[in-house]
């Protein structure tokens, strides 16, 4: 699409069964700069990522998705990325959508682009829907910004955006914290619809729907508590 240097960041925890294929699919779309952050995995995620040709950074302990993503963003800053894309490492995000996310940035129409599952095709597990609704509400209450999919991990950032924001929260609440910083920095944000790939592997995570709905609610409550704690500390 352009001469822009694009890096793909994959925070990963125990994704050894699928990470190599995920990296392969990303590279098949022409994006060869892939960084995997192995967040203290106990399986072969690290080895599989290296064998697939990804730049691989390992956390010695599991620090959380937020910490892993921030490590990846730090790395792309140092490597001089023009555009950085974050994706989930379990194969749910379609690499064909990367172009859709980076295009507004390359054309100077946005600083941050969110891939929204709510604007795309339906079929999201109910636990994820609940977590997303809670996340949207919490993001608006704490940071005054409303988007359709505040908890989406499929995002693209311009160099300007990465130079303007930095998250401190280690787990899933960092998604909301990042949006708050985007607003504070007065960066241009855009949402685009994405197609989520629900494979047998990914759906296995939600096979007991009631249990995962309860877990989604619990995670939402934990997120609120951590955001309150972070606000009080500041």
Region annotations inferred by a language model:
Residues 5-7, 177:
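Cell-envelope/extracellular polymer assembly enzymes that use nucleotide-activated donors
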Residues 7-11, 35, 58:
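Short hydrophobic beta-strand elements that form part
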Residues 13-28:
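Short, well-formed alpha-helical segments that are part of the catalytic scaffolds
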Residues 17-21, 43-52:
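Acidic helix N-cap motif at the loop->helix transition within catalytic regions
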Residues 38-46, 91:
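A conserved acidic beta->alpha catalytic loop
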Residues 61-63, 67-78, 95-172, 199-224:
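Acceptor/aglycone-binding surface of glycosyltransferases and processive sugar-polymer synthases
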Residues 81-90:
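Short beta-strand-to-loop acidic/aromatic patch adjacent to the donor-nucleotide binding site
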Residues 146, 169-170, 180-197:
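Catalytic donor-sugar/metal-binding loop of nucleotide-sugar-dependent glycosyltransferases
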